[in-house]
Amino acid sequence: DYEEYIDAKKNIFKYQNENDIVVLNYDNEITRACAKEAKGKVIFFSDKEKLDNGYIIDEDIIKICTDKIRKHLLNVNDVILRGKHNYENIATALAATSTLVDIDKAIEVIKNFKPVAHRLEFVRELNGVKWYNDSASSSPTRTLAGINAFKEPIVLIAGGYDKNLDYKPIAKPILEKVSTLILMGQTSGKIFDCVKEEMENVIK
């Protein structure tokens, strides 16, 4: 069950000592509470709270804040990766390696790091339009993460094999962020039913 899953994850820091580091998501109530059980140094990251000590994702800027330093580390617009989840991963990586590598070198690596294939993978830019391949996002939850990764207007190609999932959760984000929706495959009808009352630019 979920409690067993949480306990299993705690094994990551269960056998640490005071010289070790554990990086935790401050915005998640469960991971925040894990700090009480950590034996090593706890470093938090957050994209919601202005932490006095930790790594902050503030709009487009990743910052470090400690008792001794407050510094802008990276503008997320300078990296190839897109999406809130990736920016959280970047903050985590910077925190985890903060005592091991030169942070400027780490930032250079991050700026040039390319995502794995089919996961918000940048394909090309043509006539001012940037094309991304996110075909690995085969569930509504992952499609939602992909949609939320962009501030620009989106032309979304969606659909595919029907896994009998609920597509209602992505209706509102599609209506808010997608200018044109192109549907295909077995799930095209289900997705269309979620947006047909309010969306005009749909191609089936």
Report the location of each language-model feature.
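Short internal beta-strands
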Residues: V22-Y26, I157-A158, K177-Q186
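Short, charged/polar "capping" segments at the starts of alpha-helices
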Residues: N28-A33, K50-D52, N164-L165, T187-D193
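Phosphate-binding loop of NTP-binding sites
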Residues: D1-Y26, I30-K41
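C-terminal helical cap/extension that packs against the catalytic core
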Residues: I170-K204
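Residue-level detector of structured alpha->beta connecting loops
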Residues: N17, K39, K151, L175-V178, ...
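Hydrophobic packing residues within well-ordered alpha-helices of enzyme cores
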Residues: T31-A35, A106, G146, I170, ...
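Extended acidic/charged loop-beta regions that coordinate divalent cations
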Residues: D1, R32-D78, V116-R119, V123
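Nucleotide phosphate-binding/pyrophosphate-handling subdomain across enzymes
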Residues: L73-T180
